[in-house]
Amino acid sequence: MNNRVHIFDTTLRDGEQSPGVSLNLNEKLQIARQLARLGVDIIEAGFPITSPGDFAAVQAVAREVRGVTVAGLARANFKDIDVAWDAIKEAEQARIHTFIATSDIHLKYKLRKDREQVIEAAVAAVKHARKYTSDVEFSAEDASRSDIDYLCRIFQEVIKAGATVINVPDTVGYTTPGEYAQFIRDILEKTPGMEKIVLSVHCHDDLGLAVANSLAAVGAGARQVEGAINGIGERAGNAALEEVVMGLYTRKDYYGLMTGINTPEIYRTSRLVSSLTGMPVQPNKSVVGKNAFAHESGIHQDGVLKERTTYEIMNPEQVGITANNLVLGKHSGRHAFRDRLEELGYHLNEEELNLAFSRFKVLADKKKEITDHDLQAMVEDEIKHIPDTYVLKYLHISTGTAVVPTATLGLQMGDELKEEAACGDGPVDAIYKTVDKITGISCTLVNYAINAITGGKDALGDVTVKIRCEEKEKVYIGRGVSTDILEASAKAYVNAINKLIHDMQ
């Protein structure tokens, strides 16, 4: 059996279904380009028929991202499939991913169809998709709760109809590793034609078993794993692809399998997805968490200092985590700055480099010791890929225990400097009310989070906000970075407002 496992990334489709996550087209393109650098085999760019915005994003990914298969999701009906093809047809390699539920509970309550009707719909959908492309994936939604004999029968029929990938999702995260492995073995054994196709798995994390189930499945013969970066997704999320990949990489002695993933790009991909979705990575998360390679216990520290492999089964460099050392200072030049950014995986054009270097010089005057983490946060904050309708020019705060907090600030809009002041319930609230007065946009703050990038009194503060506007149902995510927490808070809110305005235009 082939020992190559294909990695199917659904961060832009299933991952974006996480509550409170809403990515614009440019953000989806950023993630897609990084996924291509990471080396995933397939990017599921979205569900084109759901909205014009989703269609445009899938189409943009298909047009602009090369070296990877781009998939569009479609229900098992002709209209969905036609729209999916229109969105992905300019891809270097295009895949239509069509699905229908197969469990009795879904047939009875959701589809209101009998088993024969579902088989007919699945076969017709695959045949229709094959008119457009030779790469067609069929998914049996809620497969893990479906009758095995019926599942094998529908798989046999869609293989005859032309499906090249068969996906067996654990849609509600119900199964367990041993059970799922046997399920996969039974499907491979009982279904004629399986030797012609790639068997795929798509696991959800409702019981915290998505990665374990995915690894059990590839051990049983599956050769494609679907999941999302950082494990994001609706409800409890999807299998975290970085964990699946490093599980196979670290335990190749056990699995004997390989992927095409460029593992040093894992950490940067995780950071990018976290930054753009506004979903922080928990510190103790496997592979990419802040504490994944930290050792607190004296016994552990002593062991690692003597020999890393005493307590580290992976080393940080394998996933792209660099040592947090002093790298640059205020006397560092543009060439050294560019070289260090490229070592960290950032390849900026001239305009982006000029912006980032100007920001670096300002930071270097405020902060004596600049680390890799500082540089990463600064560059990710500076390079936003949307036009700034408003730019924060200055900020003044009056606050104290016996003073009503007041913010005065100026926002540059083209050639005009707009200035206002407002009081609030705390300095951050005062800032946001002032921004609302200037922009004329009334927003609800859904979430506010702050994180210190590094230690010390001059640490960079990284603020993420989520806002919802009365005129739009979407949530907009903004990010701001500064050694001054209030300035970072203001920049994050203005960034979110700029995204909202860009979306409305």
Swiss-Prot record:
Disulfide bonds: none annotated. This is 2-isopropylmalate synthase. It comes from Desulforamulus reducens (strain ATCC BAA-1160 / DSM 100696 / MI-1) (Desulfotomaculum reducens). The lineage of its organism: Bacteria, Bacillati, Bacillota, Clostridia, Eubacteriales. Homodimer. InterPro entries: 2-IPM_HCS-like (IPR050073), 2-isopropylmalate_synth_dimer (IPR013709), AIPM/Hcit_synth_CS (IPR002034), Aldolase_TIM (IPR013785), LeuA/HCS_post-cat (IPR054691), LeuA_allosteric_dom_sf (IPR036230), LeuA_bact_synth (IPR005671), PYR_CT (IPR000891). Belongs to the alpha-IPM synthase/homocitrate synthase family. LeuA type 1 subfamily. GO terms for molecular function: 2-isopropylmalate synthase activity; acetyl-CoA C-acetyltransferase activity; manganese ion binding. Its cofactor is Mn(2+).
